[in-house]
Amino acid sequence: MATGEAMHLLLDTGHATWGGASPAALARRYHDRISHFHAKDVRPDVRRRSDSEGWSFLDSVLAGVYTVPGDGLIDYVRVLRELQGYSGWIVVEAEQDPKKAEPATYAKLGHANLSRFVKEAGLG
C-alpha cells in the first residue's frame, strides 16, 4: 500500500471548498503529489441556505450547490497559479441536475471559463 509521499492526490476544488479548505492552499501544499484535478465551483447562495437550514450534503447537491468553474465563489486564477507545472488532466465537473442545468450549456461555460482562467494565471 502506498503511503506518504508515494500517495498521489486528486484535487477537487468543490469538495475542498465544501469541507472548509482553500483549494489554492491545498494546491500549494501538495503540488508535487497532485495527479488529478476536478474543477467544480460552489454557488455561495445555495451554500448559505444549506448551512443555515442544516441540509445534508446530498440535499445540497440536489439543490445545485455545485456548478462549473467561474459560476461560483472559487478563485480559479489563484488555484491555477499554484499548479504551475501540473501536466495532468483537468476535469470540469458540476454535479448538477440536468433538468435544472442543461449539461452541454454548462460544459461549454465551464470550458470557456477555465480556458480564460488558465490564460489569466499565465499558464497558456
Predicted regions mapped to residue ranges:
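Histidine-acidic metal/acid-base catalytic patches
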Residues: 2-11, 15-124
